[in-house]
Amino acid sequence: MRMKMFAAESLEAAKAMIFAEMGDDAIILSEREVPGGVEVRAATDKLGGGMVPSGSGIISRIGAPLTPRLTDNPLRNRVRDALLWHGAPQRFAERVADSGFASDTSVTDPTAAISAGLEKHIICRPIAPRLENDILLVGPPGHGRTAVAAKLTRRASVTKSEVLPVAADLDSTAGGAQLAAYLEREQDQIRSVSTPDALFETLKTIRDNKQRCVIDLPAIVPFDQEDMASLQDLIPVIKAEPVLVISAEGHPEDQADMAKAFARCGIKRAIVTKLDVTRRRGGIVSALSSAGIAFAHLAVTPFIGGGLVPATPNRLAQLLTEDAPAHVALRGAA
């Protein structure tokens, strides 16, 4: 027989965890109330891979006090379960949950616990409104690069600094017209180029005038070797910081593969989009963490004005607290 202790907010929640892991044949051995919830000990005759002994029998027999295990903390398990609900991989959810309580086991707020855990596993580096470098926006098709280019341009104008939008329409998809529409400008007010030579000439003029720009590059398919090779060749020639624009939508493993592919091309920062239409956001957080890419901004509304929020562990934690709406992290958008 194998035994295990389960911790949850309620007896019903604990039983659900027990039967999900041990099966319908599990037997409840004991239950007791603890701060923040209940602890329930259960047993089964099945030797499943997830079964672990509930404690050291030798230590118990000699009378030594048992050290409380982190996995017996109901709030810690709530943090883990919230991340799992959001689609985060099991190992990432466990690591964040453990890290959230590693330095302070007295934490009582789930958001604070998630935030503390994320601080150990992610990097946040927002882009300043007054750009230090030109920005080259890259990303897969349909992830919102052009909208982000417009948002960065609008954000700069609000803070009394100028950022010039450049549509690198190298694939002839009318990117300039779309960018102009987002910014409510005439198309001749947008710097739109259709060839690499025209792009380099435009960038030279902008830099000679000591101005900064945001370049909206055509979509890159991260699983296409030719696309990624072209991007890798282009980045050092353009001499602008490449920033990944990636949607919160999608399968966590696909997101992880995409993030790692762009990281291999030298991308260090990302702007996460479509958080307003995505309920489960754990996959993208884990993906960027595993790829070593820093969070720059979060796009939590479709509107061009006020559409970007500087990324922080606390803002991400608010988005990962179970079924949290995106607007909880909107404060501070620019």
Language-model features, listed with the residues they occupy:
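Short hydrophobic alpha-helical runs that function as membrane-insertion/retention elements
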Residues: 7, 26-30, 164-166, 189-193, ...
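Hydrophobic positions on the alpha1 helix immediately C-terminal to the Walker A/P-loop
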Residues: 148, 152, 178
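Conserved catalytic-core segment of NTP-binding enzymes
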Residues: 178, 195-204, 212, 220-327
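Pre-Walker A (Motif I) flank of P-loop NTPase domains
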Residues: 130-135
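Conserved lysine of the Walker
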Residues: 145
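Non-catalytic terminal/linker segments enriched in charged/polar, low-complexity residues
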Residues: 1-128, 159-161, 329-333
